């Protein structure tokens, strides 16, 4: 599913202009009186909607006036992505904000956090607890390891985002700093902190990350991806 690609200025405007909402689920006993706004959904004795619109309804709740409120955000500007029609595997607990583009057969694992404007290529896996900041771009058939961070750039608007090429492996807990580009076919070792651009088909490691060798057959075997994990 393709989102409308937005540059930094458009994302900033999107957030600034968005109506800030506190989405809630309210389960209640008793009878509601008064008109329910069109934006509030009522299913039996459960209400879904913005707290600012639901709160006045509860004042008119008759009988025992018992209700429970469930919420996970306050004055949120960016909703979560509607994942229903995305042709990818997205596991429970992944947090993906609106205006994110996810390619076919990508895999998003539990606990991954993907911010507004990020792009994930077809067949790419974002592993458990990895973070893709705003506007971060990952190419096709790559792997971002567990706990890795691709730094986001929303402000300043002139800054360049992180760009990761195709067939790249980023090891667990690695960090890629704002504006860095990782060339296709390269490997970033676990725990590395990448502060400069990385050319294609090399291995980088360390803090700060430095090139330690070019990709050879042994490295390719160790870092090969499993297509079966991307089958839907």
Swiss-Prot record:
Alphabetic keyword roster: Acyltransferase, Amino-acid biosynthesis, Diaminopimelate biosynthesis, Lysine biosynthesis, Repeat, Transferase
Keyword Nucleotidyltransferase included in the entry's annotation: no
Catalysed transformations (reactions): (S)-2,3,4,5-tetrahydrodipicolinate + acetyl-CoA + H2O = L-2-acetamido-6-oxoheptanedioate + CoA
Domain of life according to the entry: Bacteria
Pathway: Amino-acid biosynthesis; L-lysine biosynthesis via DAP pathway; LL-2,6-diaminopimelate from (S)-tetrahydrodipicolinate (acetylase route): step 1/3
Pfam families: DapH_N, Hexapep, Hexapep_2
Keyword DNA-binding: no
Disulfide bond entries: none
Top EC class, one word: transferase
One annotated GO biological process: diaminopimelate biosynthetic process
CDD domains documented for this protein: LbH_THP_succinylT
GO terms, molecular function: tetrahydrodipicolinate N-acetyltransferase activity
EC number: 2.3.1.89
Stated family: Belongs to the transferase hexapeptide repeat family. DapH subfamily.
Role of this protein: Catalyzes the transfer of an acetyl group from acetyl-CoA to tetrahydrodipicolinate.
Protein name: 2,3,4,5-tetrahydropyridine-2,6-dicarboxylate N-acetyltransferase
Organism of provenance: Streptococcus gordonii (strain Challis / ATCC 35105 / BCRC 15272 / CH1 / DL1 / V288)
